[in-house]
Amino acid sequence: KLNIYKNFPDEKSFDNLIEKTFTNYYDQWNADYIIERGDWITPYNLKLLQKYFKNNKIKIVILVRDVLDILGSMLNVCRRNAEFYINRQYEFSDKSTVIFEKKEELAEIIMHRDNYIYTVLYSINNLLKENTFKDYIFVEYNDLVSKPDITLKNIYNFFDIKHFKHDFNNVKEFEVNGIKYEDSVFGGKLHKLKTGKLERQEYQIKVPQRVVDKYSGLEMWRKINNEK
């Protein structure tokens, strides 16, 4: 396959195109403030931000949660949705290579280094270890659910934007410009939100102790906060 860029390396024009990505994407959004959601803390993505937005203040909020809770939440989606992509990965796997019960095998797929949770964990670890980018805060999921008003005010203060009064008794599904998440592509409801009053949902997922032992204590951001 030919490398077109090397054939005509117009780097300045490509840089100009990339620098205007956010401006062009959000050009028709009717909003005073837009907080971009994405995997911006991966080492590669963060370098891109720093390269193309070096004249802007980059601030990142990192939503974190107990890793075992995340794993349990994903296993709960597996339990409720037979066609969920994690279940399908398991069903298509070579069963002659399987040594654990199904639930443990599903946990291994979810936590695999090529999947999302591991990507976020190594990105946080790299962020803390390199310590070259410091304009970020961690927001605990438990704080967001148990004391949302205080937590959101902290986020607004971090971004230096005015506070917005929320109705935590009337939480709605996320929708913007008439568009909602279409989770059928995943085979399960990844973004399904309990509408109405904001409160933590409890459910029980039993997994072998090996799984608990393996994925306990991975919340490295808490160790840093405790050291401070």
Regions found by a protein language model. Give the residues of each.
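Short beta-strand segments
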Residues: I34-R37, I62-V64, F138-E140
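Short, surface-exposed basic-aromatic patches at helix termini and helix-loop junctions that form
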Residues: L49-N55, K153-F158
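A general structural motif
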Residues: N30-D32, N55-I58, K134
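PAPS-dependent sulfotransferases, especially Golgi type II membrane carbohydrate sulfotransferases
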Residues: V98-M111, L121, N125-K134, D149-I150, ...
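Short catalytic/ligand-binding loop motif for oxyanion handling, primarily in non-cytosolic enzymes
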Residues: T42-N45, L68-S73, V145-P148, K172-E175
